[in-house]
From Swiss-Prot:
Pathway: Cofactor biosynthesis; iron-sulfur cluster biosynthesis. InterPro entries: Cysteine_desulfuration_SufE (IPR023939), Fe-S_metab-assoc_dom (IPR003808). HAMAP family: SufE (MF_01832). This is Cysteine desulfuration protein SufE. GO terms for cellular component: cytoplasm. Participates in cysteine desulfuration mediated by SufS. Cysteine desulfuration mobilizes sulfur from L-cysteine to yield L-alanine and constitutes an essential step in sulfur metabolism for biosynthesis of a variety of sulfur-containing biomolecules. Functions as a sulfur acceptor for SufS, by mediating the direct transfer of the sulfur atom from the S-sulfanylcysteine of SufS, an intermediate product of cysteine desulfuration process. NCBIfam families: PRK09296.1. The lineage of its organism: Bacteria, Pseudomonadati, Pseudomonadota, Gammaproteobacteria, Enterobacterales. Keywords: Cytoplasm. It comes from Escherichia coli O6:K15:H31 (strain 536 / UPEC). Its main location: cytoplasm. Homodimer. Interacts with SufS. Belongs to the SufE family.
Length: 138
């Protein structure tokens, strides 16, 4: 399983894409790089409401206080969007997550302007859920 890029490399890779179709394929590729989520993690408490597809995001805090995120979806593009979100929140504490605004990153990648309204709403639901869980831990 290939590793996910860091934030800066993610942005560079997005900017190298010639058109939205290439970005779409790259998002799907990122989703394919995510490790499989265990069946027991596909539970109601990890389910994200507000997404058209089934989405699960698991948040764990390691001994150093850093949040580790895992996620899965039954839709390839959504799984890729989960990967993008995981990359953006990588190596953050709960307070870092609460304070971090992902929107400028989405704007730099021209991500949300090419998503359908339902995908954009689902992406926002993921961000809200992650921030709420992080706030509860901080």
């Amino acid at each position: 399983m290939a590793l996910l890029p860091d934030k800066e490399k993610l942005l560079r890779n997005f900017l190298r894409c010639a058109n939205w179709e290439e970005k779409y394929l790259y998002i799907i590729e990122l989703g394919q790089r995510l490790p499989e989520l265990r069946d027991e993690d596909k539970s109601p408490q990890n389910s994200i409401q507000g997404c058209q597809s089934q989405v699960w995001i698991v948040m764990r805090q390691n001994a150093q206080g850093i949040i580790e995120l895992q996620g899965d979806s039954d839709a390839a593009i959504v799984k890729g969007l989960i990967a993008v979100v995981i990359i953006l929140y990588d190596q953050m504490t709960p307070q870092d997550i609460v304070n971090f605004d992902v929107r400028p990153w989405f704007e730099k990648m021209a991500l949300t302007q090419h998503l359908t309204p339902s995908r954009s709403q689902g992406l926002e639901a993921m961000i809200r859920a992650i921030r709420a869980k992080a706030a509860a831990l901080s």
